[in-house]
């Protein structure tokens, strides 16, 4: 993905993630309400974020709320497979005030459109905790369909196991 590409939507824009976003993203990823929905369930340090950023900068975008002109989350296409024309989708909304407003669904539509139209992908898939109803609703709204349930696939910090859903959208 071209890191200079900016994608415009109705209420959001997707712009490249920069090193200047580090303090904000570290704050988001250190919030238990955010990292509790991710597969890495622990706060993140600035150094770990910089390592993550180096790995994700080519495929990640910062979600910007156009009304307030401020970042509210991040979205990615990762594990891009050029042979089989597929990629994994990932997102988190870091700002509490941005949740429940359809921003996640719009970001998903913008990113999947980009993946299909610009990258030539055929399939975009994701993994989500089966208990994350808000995210599942957002993904369905964006056109993702459930493909299966991975029972007790993830061991949580509290020692309990969680089911994970696999969802995808096709071109």
What is the meaning of each model-derived region?
Residues 1-50:
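A short, well-structured alpha-helix characteristic of acyl/acetyltransferase catalytic modules
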Residues 42-98, 170-171:
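Acetyl-CoA-dependent GNAT
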Residues 69-73, 134, 161:
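Glycine-rich acetyl-CoA-binding "A-motif" of GNAT/NAT acetyltransferases
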Residues 104, 108, 131-135, 152-157:
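Short glycine/proline-centered loop/turn elements that form peptide/ligand docking sites
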Residues 117-127:
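Conserved GNAT acetyl-CoA-binding A-motif
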Residues 139, 144, 167:
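Conserved active-site tyrosine of GNAT-family acetyltransferases
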């Amino acid at each position: 993905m071209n890191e200079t590409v900016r994608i415009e939507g109705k209420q959001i824009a997707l712009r490249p993630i920069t090193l200047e976003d580090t303090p904000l993203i570290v704050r988001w990823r250190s919030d238990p309400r955010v990292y509790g929905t991710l597969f890495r369930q622990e706060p993140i340090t600035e150094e770990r974020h910089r390592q993550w950023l180096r790995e994700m900068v080519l495929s990640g975008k910062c979600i910007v709320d156009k009304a307030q002109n401020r970042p509210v989350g991040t979205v990615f296409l990762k594990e891009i497979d050029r042979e089989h024309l597929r990629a994994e989708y990932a997102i988190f909304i870091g700002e509490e005030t941005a949740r429940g407003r359809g921003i996640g669904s719009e970001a998903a539509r913008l990113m999947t459109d980009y993946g299909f139209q610009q990258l030539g992908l055929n399939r975009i898939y994701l993994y989500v905790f089966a208990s994350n109803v808000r995210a599942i609703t957002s993904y369905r709204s964006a056109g993702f369909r459930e493909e299966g349930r991975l029972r007790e696939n993830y061991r949580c910090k509290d020692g309990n196991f969680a089911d994970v859903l696999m969802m995808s959208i096709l071109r």
